[in-house]
Design a protein with these regions (language model features):
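Carboxylate-rich, polar loop motifs that coordinate divalent cations or form catalytic acidic clusters
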Residues: 1-298
Length: 298
C-alpha cells in the first residue's frame, strides 16, 4: 500500500512542508525527511517528529535541505542552499554542532549550495558543491576543496553534483557540464588534479549527455549515471559505457540494499535488476506507472 503524507497546519505531527527534497533511512529504520521548512523524523513508521533547525544550530538562519547523511559512526550531515550543518546527538541533546558556509571564519565551505554528501568505504565524508568537491578532515574539522580536470583542461568538477567510491577504491565524480571523472583516492588527496578517466558526450565511449545529475553503484559494481533523459551504465573493469534507456526526465536515481537500481521520472518508477544480464543496451527491468513526478526515494 502507498501512504501519502502531507502538511496539515492543525496537526503538529504532520510533515512541516509539502515540498520534499531529500529522505534518508537511518540504522534504526527511522525515516528522515528534508523539506523547505525543516526536518521531520518518521519513527518506527508510525509518526513524524518535527525538528526546527534552530533547535539544532541555535541560529535563526534557515537552510533549504537537499541532502542528508548519517555516517556509520552516528554523525549527522545536512546540506542545501545555505551551507552544510554537522552535529551528533546523545541523551544530552545536539553536540559538536558546526555550520559550514562561505566566508565563515570558523567553518569555511567552498560554496553554500550543497548537492551531495557521501561517506566512502573508509568512513571519509565528501561534499559536492557548486564550487568543487570538499573532503572533511576530522582531525581539524575543516574542509579541503578539490577541483578535478580532464587532461585537456576543458572539463572540470567546478559544479560537482555527485560522488562515489567504486569497489576498487577509485573516486568517481559527476559534474554539471563536465561529465564524469575517475581517479585514485590517494592520488586525489595527495593533490593530483588531473583525472585518470574522463567521460563526456563526445567520442566512441561517450555518455548520453554532459550534465551528470546522479551516479549510483549496483550490486555488480557497475556505475549508473543519469544525464537528464537517459541512463548510462559503466563497467568498472573495462570502463565501457552502455546507454541504457530513454526516459521522460531522470529525476532521481538510487540503489537498494540488494543492489538493484531504481529510477524515478515524471510519471513512473523503474527498477533495473542487478542480477539481470546485459545484452547490448537491454537490461532486466520493471516499470510502475504512478502518474506523478518522483522527487526523491529512500
Amino acid at each position: 500500500a502507498i501512504i501519502h503524507y502531507i502538511h496539515d497546519s492543525r496537526d503538529d505531527a504532520s510533515i512541516p512542508n509539502n515540498i520534499v527534497w531529500a529522505c534518508f533511512v537511518d540504522k534504526w529504520q527511522n525515516v528522515w525527511v528534508g523539506t523547505d521548512n525543516g526536518l521531520s523524523r518518521l519513527t518506527t513508521h508510525t509518526y513524524y517528529r518535527y525538528v526546527s533547525l534552530d533547535k539544532i544550530t541555535m541560529s535563526g538562519e534557515g537552510n533549504c535541505l537537499h541532502a542528508m547523511l548519517q555516517t556509520r559512526n552516528g554523525e549527522w550531515w545536512m546540506g542545501g542552499t545555505n551551507g552544510l550543518i554537522h552535529f551528533t546527538r546523545n541523551a544530552e541533546g545536539y553536540q559538536n554542532v558546526a555550520w559550514y558556509k562561505q566566508n565563515s571564519s570558523a567553518f569555511p565551505l567552498s560554496h553554500n549550495r550543497v548537492r551531495k554528501i557521501y561517506e566512502d568505504h573508509d568512513g571519509d565524508v565528501w561534499i559536492c558543491t557548486d564550487h568543487g568537491i570538499n573532503f572533511y578532515d576530522r582531525s581539524s574539522r575543516q574542509m579541503r576543496n578539490f577541483i578535478v580536470y580532464d587532461k585537456s583542461g576543458k572539463y572540470s568538477t567546478a559544479w560537482a553534483y555527485d560522488i562515489l567510491q567504486d569497489k576498487k577504491g577509485r573516486i568517481w565524480m559527476g559534474s554539471y557540464q563536465g561529465g564524469v571523472f575517475v581517479m585514485d583516492k590517494a592520488a586525489l588527496l595527495s593533490g593530483k588534479t588531473i583525472a585518470d578517466w574522463h567521460y563526456s558526450d563526445k567520442g566512441k565511449n561517450a555518455l548520453s549527455g554532459l550534465h551528470v545529475g546522479q551516479m549510483v553503484m549496483d550490486g555488480k559494481g557497475r556505475i549508473w549515471v543519469s544525464t537528464y533523459t537517459r541512463l548510462n551504465c559503466i563497467n568498472p573493469n573495462n570502463m565501457k559505457v552502455v546507454q541504457v534507456a530513454n526516459s521522460d526526465v531522470v529525476n532521481y536515481l538510487m540503489a537498494d540494499s540488494k543492489g538493484n537500481i531504481w529510477m524515478g521520472d515524471n510519471t513512473s518508477v523503474t527498477c533495473y535488476y542487478a542480477a539481470g544480464s546485459v545484452l547490448g543496451n537491454s537490461f532486466s527491468s520493471k516499470t510502475w506507472q504512478i502518474g506523478d513526478k518522483v522527487s526523491t526515494m529512500c
